Design a protein with these regions (language model features):
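FMN-binding flavodoxin-like domain, especially the glycine-rich phosphate-binding loop
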Residues: 16, 24, 28, 33, ...
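General secondary-structure propensity
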Residues: 1-7, 148-153
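Conserved SAM/SAH-binding loop
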Residues: 37-39
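N-terminal beta1-alpha1 ligand-phosphate binding loop
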Residues: 2-28
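Glycine-rich His-Gly loop
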Residues: 8-9, 53-54, 85
Length: 181
């Protein structure tokens, strides 16, 4: 079974997650490859798709959303999973007692759930390097505002065991698929 792990990233943390998922699927005996959404013109060669994107301010990166909308017919006809990376820090619960990963779900997932009927979705913690070159006006402004810059915890917060477990779950579901599905 051939699996595409397509992703949209801004600074590379989502690339790392996509590559880890593809490696885990490959280790489970599937043929998987991670590719940026901008490099994928056709999903027809793939039997299943895992689609991921970084999220900023509760919104998935536009290239991931555009990819999902553009390929919605083909994606809805095969097994699909969605993931997002973005929340920073190690706290699983926010100051209001809510699950950080659940409340960080990108707003676009509601629309994409209706369009694509994904088998699952997951939000993972992301990474932030305050010394990375800024992308876009918003990031340039944050870099020049010390209070805003210091409000974001710096570091790599990706939970590799959680990512591996999610990929293993996908692999198990795909291995249980009747061939030709």
């Amino acid at each position: 079974m051939k699996v595409l792990v397509a992703y949209a990233t801004r600074h590379g943390a989502t690339t790392g997650i996509a590559e880890r998922v593809a490696a885990a699927l490959t280790a489970a005996g599937l043929s998987a490859q991670a590719r940026p959404v901008e490099d994928v013109k056709d999903v027809e060669p793939y039997d299943a798709v895992v689609l991921g994107g970084a999220a900023y301010m509760f919104h998935w990166l536009k290239p991931a959303v555009t990819f999902a909308r553009r390929h919605r017919t083909e994606l809805a006809a095969r097994p699909v999973w969605l993931f997002s990376s973005g929340p920073l820090g190690t706290d699983l619960v926010d100051k209001d007692g809510k699950n950080v990963l659940e409340t960080s779900r990108p707003k676009e997932f509601d629309e994409l759930t209706k369009l694509l009927h994904p088998r699952g979705e997951q939000v993972f913690f992301g990474a932030y390097d305050p010394d990375a070159p800024p992308v876009g006006l918003g990031e340039r402004l944050v870099q020049h505002m010390p209070a805003a810059r210091n409000a974001l915890p710096a570091g790599d917060f990706r939970d590799w065991p959680a990512i591996d477990a999610w990929a293993a779950q996908i692999a198990a579901e795909l291995e249980a698929e009747p061939r030709g599905q």
